[in-house]
Curated annotation (Swiss-Prot):
UniProt-recorded name of the protein: 3-dehydroquinate dehydratase
A Pfam family of this chain: DHquinase_II
Binding site for substrate: 73, 79, 86, 100-101, 110
UniProt cross-references to CDD domains, sorted A to Z: DHQase_II (cd00466)
Gene Ontology biological process terms from the UniProt entry: amino acid biosynthetic process; aromatic amino acid family biosynthetic process; chorismate biosynthetic process; quinate catabolic process
Residues in the signal sequence: none
Function: Catalyzes a trans-dehydration via an enolate intermediate.
Enzyme class: lyase
GO molecular function, one term: 3-dehydroquinate dehydratase activity
Lineage: Bacteria, Pseudomonadati, Pseudomonadota, Gammaproteobacteria, Alteromonadales
Gene it is expressed from: aroQ
Family as reported in the entry's similarity comment: Belongs to the type-II 3-dehydroquinase family.
Length: 144
């Protein structure tokens, strides 16, 4: 069986490397995706990636994917998007939620997630390494 993971990055993550590097780090999204692509390839897993600032594009990608696992950093949509939640529940694909920063150590409005209670797991506060942790967990589950 061919294993596939869909990596979803939400709004403003295209600015990684220059947006608040003290919070989000110095790596660009392209750097992170390249690293994850290598990790996936080494494990014999296909990695599909989308980043968008538009909620509907992320929803369409969720609806269209044939991946068996999703890793999502919904960014600001974490706290606002019932639509993303419904899309994830609608396709019934297990997912991990990732955040670069520790959202629980930040402003109170960032403490609530519309996705966390449905995620396999939530990884936050480890910077770009959080994606690596999520992908390793996804690969382990896919190959179990």
């Amino acid at each position: 069986m061919n294993h596939k993971v869909l990596l979803i990055n939400g709004p403003n993550l295209n600015l990684l490397g220059r947006r608040e590097p003290s919070v989000y780090g110095h790596q660009t999204l392209a750097d992170i995706v390249a690293l994850l692509s290598e990790q996936a390839q080494a494990a014999g897993v296909e990695l599909e990636h989308i980043q968008s600032n538009a909620e509907f594009e992320l929803i369409n990608a969720i609806h269209a994917t044939d991946a068996q696992m999703i890793i999502i950093n919904p960014a600001a949509f974490t706290h606002t998007s019932v639509a993303l939640r419904d899309a994830l529940l609608g396709v019934d694909i297990p997912f991990f939620e990732v955040h670069l920063s520790n959202v629980h150590a930040r402003e109170p409005f960032r403490h609530h997630s519309y996705l966390s209670d449905k995620a396999i797991g939530v990884i936050c506060g480890f910077g770009a390494q959080g994606y690596e942790f999520a992908l390793a967990a996804a690969i382990k589950r896919l190959k179990a």
